[in-house]
Amino acid sequence: MVKVAINGFGRIGRLVLRIALQRKALEVVAVNDPFISVDYAAYMFKYDSTHGRYKGEVTTSGNDLVIDGHKIAVFQEKDPANLPWGKLGVDIVIDSTGVFKELDSAQKHLDAGAKKVVITAPSKTAPMFVVGVNEDKYNGETIVSNASCTTNCLAPIAKIINDEFGIDEALMTTVHSITATQKTVDGPSHKDWRGGRTASGNIIPSSTGAAKAVGKVLPELQGKLTGMAFRVPTVDVSVVDLTVKLAKEATYDEIKAAVKKASQGKLKNVVGYTEDSVVSSDFLGDTHSTIFDASAGIQLSPKFVKVVAWYDNEYGYSERVVDLVEHVA
């Protein structure tokens, strides 16, 4: 059994716990969040406005969260270096705080006795891995990043298209559901003025490093891809719109066939494929990183095409976090 601790019990941390509990090879032994007491952790885990109630039994015992009889120690420590990871025999820490996402800060978990760290955010300094794209390049690094939910949606599709037809250049737009950092009403947001506007009543243009990050996990696309985001008032599920200038001429049917083939092969759990007339809520709880929407894409000419792919930016991403944990273990 691989012993796992979760640092940061927000949207991703809680879903990662739900998923990890279903994996036979993993044992979650601890959760740390300085802002959440043990009884509140139980409540937040049990009830979820987006993904519904947890189906099993959730209680507490002293400082432990007890899920279906399985005890998980809960800590409220601000500095990861002070956590008892060594004493608990923690193999891998999943850091979903969004705070400790660089090598120097994530190192604190190793100093506390953990063997490895998986960061659930893009990182400037830690190597980034996207399951289905470059996880085979993993070479024993102790601190790794699972990149972002949008990179996990975009990279597999970009890889399939690039492998088959070549990408000369591409622009991505993600139409992205709201996240915890946005505001319920207009409020201060000094780094991103637009991001401080009411989330539920606006379409908000935003920056994203997701497209450029594809160049880190697929070096052959370095400098060929960039993108931006629109934050829209939906609670979960987002969609990538990728406009591509192809190196080789292709019909849209050939592109569809290439993605469909990949979705039935070794990328089966990562890439989904649909020709149905779907909308965003149809993908709530979908475990794929990306679902290619064959009937939404369009083609202008043999080398100029727009493809569309959906993703549950919470649940699908959390599934890949746990996949990466199993892989680095």
Curated annotation (Swiss-Prot):
Enzyme Commission numbers on file: 1.2.1.12
Subcellular location: Cytoplasm
Similarity field: Belongs to the glyceraldehyde-3-phosphate dehydrogenase family.
Gene Ontology MF terms: glyceraldehyde-3-phosphate dehydrogenase (NAD+) (phosphorylating) activity; NAD binding; NADP binding
Quaternary structure, from the entry: Homotetramer.
Organism: Kluyveromyces lactis (strain ATCC 8585 / CBS 2359 / DSM 70799 / NBRC 1267 / NRRL Y-1140 / WM37)
Sites where the protein binds D-glyceraldehyde 3-phosphate: 148-150, 179, 208-209, 231
Matches recorded under SMART domains: Gp_dh_N (SM00846)
Uppermost EC category: oxidoreductase
Lineage: Eukaryota, Fungi, Dikarya, Ascomycota, Saccharomycotina
Active site location: 149 (nucleophile)
Protein name (database record): Glyceraldehyde-3-phosphate dehydrogenase 1
Keywords: Cytoplasm, Glycolysis, NAD, Oxidoreductase
